[in-house]
Amino acid sequence: MTAKEQLKEISVRTHELVHVQYNTLNRSLIPALEKAGMHLVAAHENLTEAQSAFVDRYFEDNVYPVLTPMAMDSSRPFPLIRNKTLNIGALISKKEKSDKLNKKDKAGELLFATVQVPSVLPRVVQIPSKKDGDTTVILLEEIIERNIDKLFLSYDVVCAHPYRIMR
C-alpha cells in the first residue's frame, strides 16, 4: 500500500470506530445514566436560570483565570499544541468598530483561535439539577464554548468546537 492508500484506510477505520463509540454512548451509556438519575447536559441545551447562572459563575471564578487564548494571524506563528490535550478551536472576526489589538486585522476577516482546556480543573462539573435527587453534569469544554466570546472581546466568534491532537 502507498502512504496515501494507508491514510485512506486509516481514515475509514477511524470513522467506523468513532461511529461505534458514539452509538455506545448514545444508545447505552446515556440512557443508563439517565435511568440512574444522572443527566449530562450540553451548554446549548435549555438550561434553567439557576443552571445558567451557576455555569457562568463557574466560568468566571474557576475557568477564566487559567485560560490562555491564542489567535493566529500572519504576524504570530502557529502555537505549539501539546500532544493529547483537549482544545477549543474558534473562528473569529474583528468587530467592525473595534480599534483594539492588532491593527493589521481587517474587520470581517476570519482568524483561527485556540484555547487549551485546562487539565487542572475537573472535566465533568456538577451543576444544579432540575429535579431533587438527580445529578446533572456538564463537560468543562461545554462551559468554555458557552463563554468563549469573553476571551476575544474585540472579535465576533463565528463558531467554536473542541478538538484533540494525537501524534
What are these regions (language model features)?
Residues 1-167:
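N-terminal non-catalytic structural scaffold regions of very large proteins
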